[in-house]
Amino acid sequence: MKAGTKILCCALAALLAACGCQPTVDFTPASAPEIHDGDIVVLDMNRWREITSRDSVGVVRLWETMHLAATLQGIVNRDEPRLYIKYVVANGINVDDFWWDKCVGDGKWLDGRNVVTMYDPVKVLDAFHDKIQGLVVYDPAIASTSNVASTVAGADNLVAVRYDPRPGSIYTRLTARDYPVKVWLVNEDGSSKFHTKLEPYRWAVDNYLKTGKCSGETAAYYIDQYWMTAPGNAGMNHHQLTNHDYFVSHKGFFFDLSPWDDEPASDAPTEGNGDRAMFQSIFSEIYKLNGGTRFCHVGGFAPWAHKYSNNSRVTYKSKHEAAQTEWETVKLLSAYNAYKDADAASLGAMANASFWQHYPVKPEYPQGWTTVEDLKAKGLILSNGRISSTKKFILFYVGDYDAAAWIYQQMPMLWEDPARGTVPMMWSINPSLARRAPMVMDYLRSTATEADYFAAGDNGAGYLNPGMLEEPRPVSGLPSGVTAWAEHNKPFFKQWGLSVTGFVIDGNGPGMSLEGFKSYATFSPNGIGPQKLPDGRQAMLVDGMPILRCSGASIGDTRIEDAGQKAVSMLSQHPEFPFDWIRTILKSPTWHAGVKEYIEAQSKNYVVLDAPSYFELLRYYLEQQ
């Protein structure tokens, strides 16, 4: 075993040594109710939130129990919704309860189905034993084997179990029930089968990607069991095991790797810097599975609160900031026709996507647009055919909704704000989030006001760098993905009535050329907002599509006066150009209404517009230049 892995694994092993003890709290009822075909089982895991980061025994029990539940759920829910978990809380709201109450029963979806509540995932496994083939057992000393176990679980219909022969462990309970171990990622005597971080991934690539046992449709970028060394870094639900179910259901490949090749990975500091090469090897194989015409949906995010960044909480610090690690990850994914569904810390926990994937949505959710005649009627185009030379037209870009976990967690608070409908807001929500959270998307559309307009968030139907799709392609050298990206986006934009892509993050990748802009014009004809434009331009028109440069700066101040002052400062940076927008992240309608009132009080020339009026007026302005 190499020294770097040994150092970290010894620390993890010390934590796990306590596992011979019983859990701090016994969460298992004496008996479980019987279930029948068609019943929906609700697995209530709310009491596991009582575990704290200081409870080393409880942390281990939490990990192994959640891992069992998530991999079981992904398999059980693959073909129909049967197993629902209650666990995730955000802003004081149990969001699993919230979406269940909004969308299930009483004249809604699944009305009439019998619901059985259970508390112990082992007994839930007993109830659904016919759905699985056995166990995949992984090594507590080699952290990466936990992610490989989730890969194997989905491909082989197994549940993931951490090796621990002590009394009370999940492993002991299941082997005592005679569940067969079908795949060992640790030797049967508990000694390590693999000895470095990357060895298990090489094995998984050879046995599950190259053989086609995994689907190229999805992949999953979630922290491995290294999480247990510092569980308090990003919230106790940020093991993100609850997120695994969807990707298990879709036979996705799980990984946790650094995107950098200029330093060793934080979790293997003396093993060299091979993570990036392994990252590329994985996605090269996924690209082959997809034939260069389909895109891979990658859930998750670089675990920057634990690894691969210079964040103060990281034990072995990177020299790179968290945002740079995010951008480098997206650059790599983009090079291989993969996009991110960015479940980022510390709002990244989401349960039940494998359940909700079956939620029925409408074929189309149309949205209206505006016309030049409408703009004239509103006085936005003057009688002389020009627009005012003194006005500054402003749009609220409301984001960053590029993660299913974020809309799952945050919309129960933000969307229910009583001020919604009093201020025009361009909700920029990535339409591909409908794969994991279709009920959220449907609920937003069904309850929207005239002031709520929807655009695609970064960067269309998935978060990637579109400039990385153009030949010659950096990193991968693969053929152009520009046309394939447009074809990927078109059905999403049609179904969700979208014609604007708000913020296009170019990140560490190159900006788009004319080819890329023309491609976006085929599915986002009413506007896009990239970070990078040629020749330092602020705006341009391509095939009738208005393009407005967005620097990426956002206003995060909580106090309205502070936010308003910053907004006014930003709006004064380009006095010669009559259009600007204010990008916000996870801000409420009440906040937006307050900022609107503040900036309009500073000058009668500040005019906040709805998205259709804004982009149609921008198009008209650019056509006149």
Give residue ranges: language-model regions.
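Preference for solvent-exposed, low-hydrophobicity sequence contexts
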Residues: 26-363
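Active-site beta->alpha N-cap acidic-glycine motif
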Residues: 354-445
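Bacterial Sec-dependent N-terminal signal peptides
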Residues: 18-28
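Bacterial N-terminal signal peptides
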Residues: 9-18
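Substrate-binding cleft of extracellular glycoside hydrolase catalytic domains
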Residues: 430-498
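Catalytic grooves of carbohydrate-active enzymes
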Residues: 272-303, 394, 399-408, 412, ...
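A recurrent domain-boundary module in secreted/ectodomain proteins
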Residues: 342-372, 612-625
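Bacterial N-terminal signal peptides that target proteins for export
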Residues: 1-8
